[in-house]
């Protein structure tokens, strides 16, 4: 189910979901969401990621787990640096190495060709990418909070145009 967060009817739903996702705090009159990124405290060995809208990961044709988590980690760190308490305090290389130990066990992905036309310049801009389902297996407890966060932030290129929406479920 897709939701346009700019649609007034979606605002109550979006506010409720964000409240459930993290603790909402007031900061200088603006609302702020705190999303816990600590590993979940149970064993998770398999997840299914549904790439809802066309997703493009720069330099990657298939969303292997290491590349996917690197892009999510970088987006979360950048958002924290710009709007939160600062970039993630973690060993990025070690995180990436652990993520690369998770393997894709199923891939049912399609490449979708799409584009938009700029109203200002008339130029056509590609919005293509893969959609579908990928399943991953491995030690996932550390990574599930990042995948859940990516549901809200998107992942990959051109998320501002609606690309990179994903959902995740434990299987």
Task: Say what each PLM segment does.
Residues 1-171:
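RNA-interacting cores
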């Amino acid at each position: 189910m897709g939701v346009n967060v700019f649609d007034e009817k979606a605002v109550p739903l979006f506010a409720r979901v964000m409240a459930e996702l993290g603790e909402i705090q007031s900061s200088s009159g603006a609302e702020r969401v705190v999303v816990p990124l600590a590993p979940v405290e149970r064993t998770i060995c398999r997840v299914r990621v549904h790439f809802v809208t066309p997703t493009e990961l720069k330099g990657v044709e298939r969303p292997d787990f290491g590349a996917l988590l690197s892009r999510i980690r970088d987006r979360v760190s950048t958002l924290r640096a710009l709007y939160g308490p600062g970039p993630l305090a973690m060993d990025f290389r070690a995180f990436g190495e652990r993520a690369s130990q998770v393997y894709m066990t199923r891939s049912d992905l399609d490449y979708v060709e799409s584009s938009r036309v700029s109203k200002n310049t008339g130029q056509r801009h590609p919005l293509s990418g893969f959609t579908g389902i990928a399943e991953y297996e491995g030690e996932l407890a550390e990574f599930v909070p990042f995948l859940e966060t990516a549901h809200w932030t998107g992942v990959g290129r051109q998320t501002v145009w609606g690309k990179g929406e994903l959902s995740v479920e434990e299987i």
